[in-house]
Amino acid sequence: MKIIHVLLLVAVVAITMSPSIMAESVAEADKPGQAKKIGLFDQIDKAAAAFMKLFEG
């Protein structure tokens, strides 16, 4: 039961953070000299980084 709660919490955090993560990746891609980062794995990486920032303090 606890595993289900943890998975639901992760899903809710991922859904609520997704628009800001997408906006950040678009802003980074618009910078000169930056390669355009598009893909599921890049979004997962950004979501994991944002999730870890929540628990840093």
Swiss-Prot record:
Signal peptide per UniProt: 1-23
GO BP annotation list: venom-mediated paralysis in another organism
Function comment: Induces paralysis 1 hour after injection into insects (blowfly L.caesar) but does not appear to be lethal.
Organism: Manica rubida
Annotated protein name in UniProt: U13-myrmicitoxin-Mri1a
Modified positions (Glutamic acid 1-amide) in chain numbering: E56
Tissue: Expressed by the venom gland.
Origin superkingdom: Eukaryota
Cellular component GO terms, alphabetical: extracellular region
Taxonomic placement: Eukaryota, Metazoa, Ecdysozoa, Arthropoda, Hexapoda
